[in-house]
Amino acid sequence: MKDLHWHGHATSRLARVEMNGHRPCTIWFTGLSGSGKSTIANALDGWLHRRGCHTYVLDGDNVRQGLNKDLGFSEQDRVENIRRVGEVAKLFNDAGLIVSCAFISPYEKDRHLVRQLLNEDEYVEVFLSTSLADCERRDPKGLYRKARAGELANFTGIDSPYEPPVRPNLAFDTSTHTVNEVVGAIFDYLVAKGIVRQHGAVGRASVG
């Protein structure tokens, strides 16, 4: 690896920000299966896109059908899954995008690694704190039923641990908050951080 060198880009990050009209960031959704990560990530993505923001969603199931299809659900593979996604999110941020990442990401150390990969002021951790009981009651993919029946091993919350975030930027229980309420609160947070303005853009003077 010592013979590898990072090749600089002709287009600077600042130039991309000025063209896009907003700053890049990674919004990292973490929580149990069924807590609403993909639903809220996609709703937020649509909200931002309609306001002219350049966005993308990285979803756990989607990534495992391509980039990470060689990985299983052992602890080692889960760690590698999140590491790869963190690196992809970093590249997308370098390209100027607002990236919503929807991953169970059960281990605190892995989420911390992603935070360290990115610029601190461009990482927003959103913990969907919906209880195991509520998530299992929803069971949109039938995964909890399979895990309880012994048909699915290493399932988070059943026979594999989930470590709640120590200091998430935002936390919501989706059993008591609607999708629109959560999306609106996240958008307000992005506005407060200067990532976007209320109409979706950041002025040139705010970039730095």
Swiss-Prot record:
The keyword DNA damage does not apply. It catalyses: adenosine 5'-phosphosulfate + ATP = 3'-phosphoadenylyl sulfate + ADP + H(+). Catalyzes the synthesis of activated sulfate. The active site is at S105. It is an enzyme of class 2 (transferase). Keywords: ATP-binding, Kinase, Nucleotide-binding, Phosphoprotein, Transferase. GO terms for molecular function: adenylylsulfate kinase activity; ATP binding. PANTHER family: ADENYLYL-SULFATE KINASE 1, CHLOROPLASTIC (PTHR11055:SF63), BIFUNCTIONAL 3'-PHOSPHOADENOSINE 5'-PHOSPHOSULFATE SYNTHASE (PTHR11055). ATP binds at G31, L32, S33, G34, S35, G36, K37, S38. This is Adenylyl-sulfate kinase. GO terms for biological process: hydrogen sulfide biosynthetic process; sulfate assimilation. HAMAP family: Adenylyl_sulf_kinase (MF_00065). It comes from Pseudomonas entomophila (strain L48).
